[in-house]
């Protein structure tokens, strides 16, 4: 998951189309299956996790620091994932973060009731 996060970060700062293609090509070349396939699916918008939607993530932020402060922070930062990353303190004793494949496969199997606990556990890692 960390390598995919680095790819997304690099893509966001790369203005040139060919530069973006080189970044994606390098990632796909250096990444083993199934993460390579899941990354391609994510980049093309083919993944859907019915139980993990932005409203659920917003509710985590509101619980964490209060609704008003979260909305002010989100408005200032402008991106939900970035806002959560800035306000969510990782706990050092939670182990390594999951791989991209683990994230996708777990969220595909998770029920609506299981998803919040899974996502919070990952945010803590």
Where are the language model's segments positioned?
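N-terminal nucleic-acid-engaging modules of covalent nucleotidyltransferase systems
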Residues: 1-125
């Amino acid at each position: 998951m960390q390598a995919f996060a680095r790819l997304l970060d690099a893509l966001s700062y790369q203005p040139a189309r060919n530069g973006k293609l080189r970044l994606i090509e390098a990632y796909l070349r250096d990444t083993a299956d199934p993460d390579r396939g899941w990354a391609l699916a994510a980049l093309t918008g083919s993944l859907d996790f019915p139980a993990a939607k932005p409203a659920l993530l917003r509710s985590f932020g509101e619980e964490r620091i209060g609704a008003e402060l979260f909305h002010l922070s989100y408005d200032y930062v402008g991106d939900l994932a970035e806002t959560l990353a800035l306000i969510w303190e990782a706990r050092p004793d939670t182990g390594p973060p999951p791989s991209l494949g683990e994230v996708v496969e777990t969220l595909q199997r998770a029920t609506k009731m299981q998803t919040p606990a899974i996502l919070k556990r990952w945010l803590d890692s």
